[in-house]
Every structure is written in C-alpha cells, then in structure tokens.
Amino acid sequence: MRALLALEDGFVLEGRSFTGPGETGGEAIFNTGMTGYQEVLTDPSYAGQMVCMTYPLVGNYGVTREDMESGKVHVEAFIVKECCKVPSNWRSEISLPDYLKRHGVMGIEGIDTRALTRHLRIHGAMRGVISTQETDPARLVERARALPSMEGQNLVTRVAPAAPYRWDGERPQAVTLEPGGCAWVGKGPRLVVYDFGIKWNILRLLAQQGFDMLVVPPSFKAADVAAVGAQAVFLSNGPGDPATLKDEIAEIAKLAQTYPTAGICLGHQLLGHALGGRTMKLKFGHHGCNHPVKDLTTGRIEISSQNHGFCVDIDSLTDVEITHVNLNDGTLEGFAHKTKPVIAVQHHPEASPGPNDSRYFFARFRNMVREAAGC
C-alpha cells in the first residue's frame, strides 16, 4: 500500500505501508542500532516520535514478550528500508508487521532510509506526517507544520503511571498505600523509583542490586517519599522536554537535599534542572546503541545505548563533578554532586538494546546508598 512521508521543510519520500491504511505524525528521528527494534518500539521515551532505523533489514528475528521494555508500543510510526515478514528465530512469537498492527502503529518500508537519515542529520530532527490516505504532498507538509514542536511538550503525562506499583520481576503489580505509609516487602534498602516512562530493564537491574522498590508516579511529592519511609530515590527515563516538568523539578530539588539520588536519561536532565542547570535541544539527538562515552573518573571508554533529544548544558551546572562526556560531540553524559550523594547519567546503562559497558552504574548507586544511608 502506497504511503507518503512528508517533513515540515518540504522533504517528501514515498514508500509502502506494511501495517495497512492510516495516517500519523510526530518528530522524525533516526536510530543507528543494527538490532533491538522491539526494545526501541516499547521504550516509552520514544513517545511522540517516528523512528527511522538506519540498518536496512528489520524484523528478521520477530518479536517476543521477553524483550519488551513496557506494556505497549510507544513510537508514532516505524520507518525501515525493508521489513522481514517471515521471521526466523526460536524465540519469535509474532512477526513485526503483525505486532505493529496489534498495537495500532503504522509501519512503512521501501523508504530511502539513507536519504532520510542524511537529511535529518544535516537539517535536524523535525516534525513529519506519514499517510496512505492523502496523496497531495503539499497538504501533508502543511499537516506536519501544524504539529506541536517537541520543545515545550510534556509527554510524560502520556506514559507515566497514575498510581504506585511494585515490580514482581516480570510485570508491574498494583499496590495500595496504607494511610500510615508503605508495607515494604524486602530486606534491602527502601528505594522509591519515579516512573516518568521507565524501561523495565532498569527495574530488573535495580532488583538485582537488592533494592526493595516502590515505583511511583511523577506526582508523588517529597513529603510522600518521607511518609513511606524511603531511604533512597531513583529517577527514570522518559519522553519530551524536561523543562516542562516544573513541579516535578521542584520536588526533586527537595529530594536531592535529603536522599541518595540517581537519575538516568530524563532523570539526569531533571536532576540537572533541580541543581540549577538548564537543558537544550540537540540538533538530531542521540538514538542508538553504538555511542562512545568516556568515564572521566576511570578514563575508560564505553560504548553506550542512548535515546535522547535534549541534554543538560555542561556549562550550566555548578557544585557538580563532570563524570561522563560524549566522545562524538562533547555533550554531558554524567555528573556527581561534589558534596551530596547524587549521581546521574544521560545514556542508558541498562541498555536493552545495546552493550553492557555502563551497567556498573547500578552497583555504583548501590554502594553510594550503602555509604550515605548505612543500608
């Protein structure tokens, strides 16, 4: 089925829908990973975005429940050069086209993904529309221009939970907080995890470190954290512009004064704001599992998994030590407060997909909690 992709600057490409008729729009970006498409699709940080995969063949190993990073597909559309319709892998439970159809997400192939990637790299990520219904490119360009910019969008409200829950090792489990606080179930440090659109592998790795976790929505106040008797705080990844989360930033500023605190991706950006810094929009973002990062505390070079369109301005922070930098463009990838037990990284140490070079971050956080809180 013929499909058109139109960007706000007038750039138009023709392809074919492999998920049936429809029309959708969002910010067009590219991901440089060779594999890991299912983790990309189910990563809540991709909400509001149409993802173009630079690798030419996608879908050849199908989809399995084991590789999900959330309970649904979050991308607005999936753009590939060629989609494999008949996967070959013993773990596969469903084909990529059928999986996208099940979740009501458009997928298109036959697109010149090299041309699209080059255009976005030169001109920057931008709004776009995909349609099988509208045949006039000029009308689609106008529809793309009418979409909201990623800057100024609070997309956390689309993906964050409405109520606290626990992680049972495989799926979230609802929990009701008692008026007197929280009935912790484990023996490890009591950790409140803020879910701004969390990837499940973060919860898996925190559990491996022995934390007794309560996962909470962004609306959970610092006073609520104290009421449940938490000993540490973790801030997750998530989508959209971090500067829009002003209420959450104010609460995080209070938490960072009291608890050992760590953040990943959006959590890193929110901590940056809470410590007096600012964020800025990257031209085309960092999306993929092959981004080099240097840990300045050890001198070690890591290949990291990344997915962010915003970053903390490295010159805007005071009272922190810069711990990680991106070797492609020199942007900030991690910091630690000079006097408080606060650490954060912009990249994704939990990977999924990607290498495990940065997984030590979770052990580093566990050791920090042990030293700061004595637990």
Swiss-Prot record:
<dbReference type="GO" id="GO:0004088">
    <property type="term" value="F:carbamoyl-phosphate synthase (glutamine-hydrolyzing) activity"/>
</dbReference>
<feature type="region of interest" description="CPSase">
    <location>
        <begin position="1"/>
        <end position="186"/>
    </location>
</feature>
<comment type="similarity">
    <text>Belongs to the CarA family.</text>
</comment>
<feature type="binding site">
    <location>
        <position position="269"/>
    </location>
    <ligand>
        <name>L-glutamine</name>
    </ligand>
</feature>
<feature type="active site">
    <location>
        <position position="350"/>
    </location>
</feature>
<keyword id="KW-0665">Pyrimidine biosynthesis</keyword>
<feature type="binding site">
    <location>
        <position position="309"/>
    </location>
    <ligand>
        <name>L-glutamine</name>
    </ligand>
</feature>
<keyword id="KW-0547">Nucleotide-binding</keyword>
<comment type="function">
    <text>Small subunit of the glutamine-dependent carbamoyl phosphate synthetase (CPSase). CPSase catalyzes the formation of carbamoyl phosphate from the ammonia moiety of glutamine, carbonate, and phosphate donated by ATP, constituting the first step of 2 biosynthetic pathways, one leading to arginine and/or urea and the other to pyrimidine nucleotides. The small subunit (glutamine amidotransferase) binds and cleaves glutamine to supply the large subunit with the substrate ammonia.</text>
</comment>
<feature type="binding site">
    <location>
        <position position="240"/>
    </location>
    <ligand>
        <name>L-glutamine</name>
    </ligand>
</feature>
<dbReference type="GO" id="GO:0006207">
    <property type="term" value="P:'de novo' pyrimidine nucleobase biosynthetic process"/>
</dbReference>
<comment type="pathway">
    <text>Amino-acid biosynthesis; L-arginine biosynthesis; carbamoyl phosphate from bicarbonate: step 1/1.</text>
</comment>
<dbReference type="GO" id="GO:0044205">
    <property type="term" value="P:'de novo' UMP biosynthetic process"/>
</dbReference>
<dbReference type="InterPro" id="IPR050472">
    <property type="entry name" value="Anth_synth/Amidotransfase"/>
</dbReference>
<dbReference type="InterPro" id="IPR006274">
    <property type="entry name" value="CarbamoylP_synth_ssu"/>
</dbReference>
<dbReference type="InterPro" id="IPR035686">
    <property type="entry name" value="CPSase_GATase1"/>
</dbReference>
<dbReference type="GO" id="GO:0006541">
    <property type="term" value="P:glutamine metabolic process"/>
</dbReference>
<dbReference type="GO" id="GO:0004359">
    <property type="term" value="F:glutaminase activity"/>
</dbReference>
<keyword id="KW-0028">Amino-acid biosynthesis</keyword>
<keyword id="KW-0067">ATP-binding</keyword>
<feature type="active site" description="Nucleophile">
    <location>
        <position position="265"/>
    </location>
</feature>
<keyword id="KW-0055">Arginine biosynthesis</keyword>
<feature type="binding site">
    <location>
        <position position="310"/>
    </location>
    <ligand>
        <name>L-glutamine</name>
    </ligand>
</feature>
<comment type="pathway">
    <text>Pyrimidine metabolism; UMP biosynthesis via de novo pathway; (S)-dihydroorotate from bicarbonate: step 1/3.</text>
</comment>
<dbReference type="Pfam" id="PF00117">
    <property type="entry name" value="GATase"/>
</dbReference>
<feature type="domain" description="Glutamine amidotransferase type-1">
    <location>
        <begin position="190"/>
        <end position="375"/>
    </location>
</feature>
<dbReference type="InterPro" id="IPR002474">
    <property type="entry name" value="CarbamoylP_synth_ssu_N"/>
</dbReference>
<dbReference type="GO" id="GO:0006526">
    <property type="term" value="P:L-arginine biosynthetic process"/>
</dbReference>
<protein>
    <recommendedName>
        <fullName>Carbamoyl phosphate synthase small chain</fullName>
        <ecNumber>6.3.5.5</ecNumber>
    </recommendedName>
</protein>
<dbReference type="InterPro" id="IPR017926">
    <property type="entry name" value="GATASE"/>
</dbReference>
<comment type="subunit">
    <text>Composed of two chains; the small (or glutamine) chain promotes the hydrolysis of glutamine to ammonia, which is used by the large (or ammonia) chain to synthesize carbamoyl phosphate. Tetramer of heterodimers (alpha,beta)4.</text>
</comment>
<keyword id="KW-0436">Ligase</keyword>
<feature type="binding site">
    <location>
        <position position="45"/>
    </location>
    <ligand>
        <name>L-glutamine</name>
    </ligand>
</feature>
<feature type="binding site">
    <location>
        <position position="307"/>
    </location>
    <ligand>
        <name>L-glutamine</name>
    </ligand>
</feature>
<keyword id="KW-0315">Glutamine amidotransferase</keyword>
<feature type="binding site">
    <location>
        <position position="238"/>
    </location>
    <ligand>
        <name>L-glutamine</name>
    </ligand>
</feature>
<dbReference type="InterPro" id="IPR036480">
    <property type="entry name" value="CarbP_synth_ssu_N_sf"/>
</dbReference>
<dbReference type="Pfam" id="PF00988">
    <property type="entry name" value="CPSase_sm_chain"/>
</dbReference>
<dbReference type="GO" id="GO:0005524">
    <property type="term" value="F:ATP binding"/>
</dbReference>
<feature type="binding site">
    <location>
        <position position="266"/>
    </location>
    <ligand>
        <name>L-glutamine</name>
    </ligand>
</feature>
<feature type="active site">
    <location>
        <position position="348"/>
    </location>
</feature>
<dbReference type="InterPro" id="IPR029062">
    <property type="entry name" value="Class_I_gatase-like"/>
</dbReference>
